[in-house]
């Protein structure tokens, strides 16, 4: 029996094991997110963008026929594609983090667990 409201040694050891496991898996997840290529495209598919699971821009593809569009339409399509890629990437990252932590509410910066 632990005194002074402290957990017993077994519970403490188990908590440290779990923390170490999460830390190791977090590094694997970081590597996985870094190597992901997530696509976002405009509704008319004139513009496609790819970003990593860490939301870093990777590349852009523009159809030849985009030259027939006006400036405002091109800008709208670029923004649309970026937003879709970012949303998918962010959702993927949150899901993977949730899987990693087993649904623990860790309140990690940038990952509002209440968004899901």
Swiss-Prot record:
Localisation per UniProt entry: Cytoplasm, Nucleoid
N-terminal signal peptide: none
Keyword DNA-binding belongs to the record: yes
Comp. bias (Basic and acidic residues): 89-98
Low complexity biased stretches: 99-116
Classification via InterPro entries: YbaB-like_sf, YbaB/EbfC
Record carries keyword Cytoplasm: yes
Molecular function as annotated in GO: DNA binding
Top-level taxon of origin: Bacteria
Pfam families, A to Z: YbaB_DNA_bd
Similarity comment: Belongs to the YbaB/EbfC family.
Main location: cytoplasm
Swiss-Prot/TrEMBL keywords: Cytoplasm, DNA-binding
Region Disordered, residue ranges: 89-116
Gene3D superfamilies: Nucleoid-associated protein YbaB-like domain
Protein name, entry field: Nucleoid-associated protein P9515_00191
Function: Binds to DNA and alters its conformation. May be involved in regulation of gene expression, nucleoid organization and DNA protection.
NCBIfam families given in the database record: DNA_YbaB_EbfC (TIGR00103)
Quaternary state and interactors: Homodimer.
Source organism: Prochlorococcus marinus (strain MIT 9515)
